[in-house]
């Protein structure tokens, strides 16, 4: 069980992501993290432990952006260590995930055979690498890359993505897990 949140806004989102994660903290105490797109680049911070650990880390090394995703983790795949914390980030994509991907091992094996390395023990990093491959090698646009990846996944999950070079694009997908969308005045939310 994990908690995920995403915000696209005309205003800065980091404090609001942290507020949202505070409301979701009961869904995971093992680690927390956020990612934003700032000046077209993905920036992120994550830490083990409760949300207060991430907040303290961000006081030392702040990040900024008007679009972002966040996650609190209750470990299901992999130990509660920082490399397993979400978001999982590649060159072009950051993803947070709640749920279980039942067939992640077969995709991971295929990616390893192609020489793609993994840092974590999570099923979520596999999703990030699959979407990255579709964007960077197959030259797919983010929506198509996510759609083609998600249609192959088995399990119950909710996902939220942001992308390098796309300061107004957040994509979310779900299968079997709840995911709420919120539409505001010049901002949108997912959780």
Ranges and model annotations:
Residues 1-191:
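Conserved short alpha-helical segments that host acidic/polar catalytic motifs at enzyme active sites
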């Amino acid at each position: 069980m994990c908690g995920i949140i995403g915000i696209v806004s005309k205003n800065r989102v980091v404090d609001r992501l942290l507020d949202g994660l505070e409301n979701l903290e009961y869904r995971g105490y093992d680690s927390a993290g956020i990612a934003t797109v700032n000046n077209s680049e993905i920036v992120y911070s994550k830490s083990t432990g409760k949300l207060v650990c991430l907040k303290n880390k961000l006081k030392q090394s702040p990040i900024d952006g008007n679009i972002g995703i966040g996650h609190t983790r209750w470990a299901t795949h992999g130990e509660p260590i920082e490399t397993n914390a979400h978001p999982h980030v590649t060159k072009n994509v950051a993803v947070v995930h709640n749920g279980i991907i039942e067939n992640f091992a077969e995709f991971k094996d295929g990616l390893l055979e192609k020489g793609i390395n993994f840092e974590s023990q999570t099923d979520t990093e596999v999703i990030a690498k699959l979407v990255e491959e579709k964007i960077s090698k197959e030259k797919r646009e983010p929506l198509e890359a996510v759609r083609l990846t998600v249609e192959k996944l088995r399990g119950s999950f909710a996902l939220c993505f942001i992308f390098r070079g796309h300061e107004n694009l957040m994509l979310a997908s779900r299968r079997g897990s709840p995911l709420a969308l919120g539409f505001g005045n010049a901002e949108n939310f997912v959780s």
